[in-house]
Amino acid sequence: AVYDYYANDKITVLENLTREKLLKLKEVFSTMESFFHGKSSGLDPLNSYLSIPILINSKKDIKVTGIPSQERVGEGAVFLLDSGEVSTTAPMINIFMESMKKDGFRKMLNDKFIKYTNMCVEDFLNGDLSSLFQNTKKLSKVVFDNFKPMIPNKYHSLWQKGIANDSYFLKLCGSGGGGYILGFAKDFEKAK
């Protein structure tokens, strides 16, 4: 709303959203959000402003994408859990930045976290549900093992249970510490 009202040379979703326009919007939103959170990528407000899916390949490679239509009717679901806890971004970013000082953490980030995240995105965009659930399980385990301080304590056993019984897999939204947790279930009724 602030950008919509005050921006000069406003870029709208109705335009041809070139890479350059997306990067400009990302830069503007990064500056705006950094005022509240310290350091921000600008991706969350960009996505909210556009209200369309964007694919982020790297800091400088973002583009508008489509989400495949779901033709199959089944028991699976993507869902959100409200942790009921208010999260403050700065402490979570500090935990992450401290972890980044460790070689093992950086290696895990590149060799596992980024790898499985990218595989999940590809599986989702290609509509490959079998592979999506396999890779989401791997990602969920990597997150639990390496980002545990960012997962609200009351969700630790629930997180592990989903991985152990292969019924649902959880992923942090944003910086973690509270707020929402994204879930993927092969059979939503069983996951409940």
State what each model feature region is:
Residues 1-7:
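A generic, well-ordered mixed alpha/beta core segment in the N-terminal half of proteins
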Residues 7-13, 19, 23, 27-39, ...:
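C-terminal nucleotide
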